[in-house]
Swiss-Prot record:
Gene that encodes it: pyrF
Keyword flag Cytoplasm: no
Gene3D superfamilies: Aldolase class I
Lineage summary: Bacteria, Bacillati, Cyanobacteriota, Cyanophyceae, Synechococcales
Pathway entry: Pyrimidine metabolism; UMP biosynthesis via de novo pathway; UMP from orotate: step 2/2
Organism name: Prochlorococcus marinus (strain SARG / CCMP1375 / SS120)
The name this protein goes by in its record: Orotidine 5'-phosphate decarboxylase
Length: 240
């Protein structure tokens, strides 16, 4: 069977819980790694220069800061974020259509000013740490979790951005409503037998791809492994 995609291009490795030195040591062990995720922890620790350092090592960067503020602030933040060269940038869908539109317009402007292609903005729907029961009890939202995800994905699409972040459990329904090239990027990925940690809505890598995920965010299964290269290659092999 000939694959229509490169397994390594479907995986985004979350660089969480590490120092800068540990990040670069890990990357050296993963020559096939294409995508990395820079989240709040690493960005706060090392600042925007970490993105340049990763890109200098040939990596594509998913900047996962989940911007959520008034439209003007979101626009200014995404304008600066786009100048770093990150290929993917997250905003919270709950910021609303106007905020998402301002973020997208400003990101395009920021990238253009430094001669870079515009990043893809992705709207976070409902965090994968939320379960259905907690979602209703703690937030008091009188919608099912699935309904909320669909509402926010529709909002993201109507705002003209390139995709959204959702759990793999919602992907199949969303993919019917939002065909490619709309991106559906999914955390909450665990191979069979792996610890689910603080995730609630999870799938295996192959299940998520088959359901319609564009890319999968993986992390501790690789970063906490005694042999990260073997762990990464094992996940890739599950997609073949």
């Amino acid at each position: 069977m000939t694959l229509s995609f490169k397994p390594e291009d479907k995986l985004i490795l979350a660089l969480d819980g590490m120092s800068g030195a540990e990040v670069f040591m890990l990357i050296e062990k993963l020559p096939n790694l294409i995508w990395v995720k820079v989240g709040l922890e690493l960005f706060t620790l090392l600042g925007p220069q970490i993105i340049n350092q990763l890109r200098d090592r040939g990596k594509k960067v998913f900047l996962d800061l989940k911007f959520h503020d008034i439209p003007t602030t979101m626009g200014r933040a995404c304008y600066q974020a786009a100048k770093t060269g990150a290929e993917l940038i997250t905003v919270h869908a709950c910021a609303g259509k106007k905020g998402i539109e301002e973020a997208n317009k400003s990101a395009v402007k920021g990238a253009k000013e430094v001669g870079l292609p515009p990043p893809s903005l992705l709207a976070v729907t409902v965090l994968t740490s939320w379960g259905s029961k907690d979602f209703v009890q703690e937030l008091g939202i009188q919608q099912s979790l699935d309904q909320r995800v669909s509402l926010l994905a529709n909002l993201a699409s109507s705002a003209g951005i390139q995709g959204c972040i959702c759990s793999p459990l919602e992907v199949m329904k969303l993919r019917k409503d939002f065909p490619e090239p709309f991106q559906l990027i999914t955390p909450g990925i665990r191979s069979c037998g792996e610890n689910i940690n603080d995730q609630n809505r999870i799938m295996t890598p192959l299940e998520a791809i088959d359901a319609g995920s564009s890319k999968l965010v993986i992390g501790r299964e690789v970063t906490s492994s005694e042999n990260p290269s073997d762990a990464f290659n094992r996940i890739c092999s599950q997609l073949i």
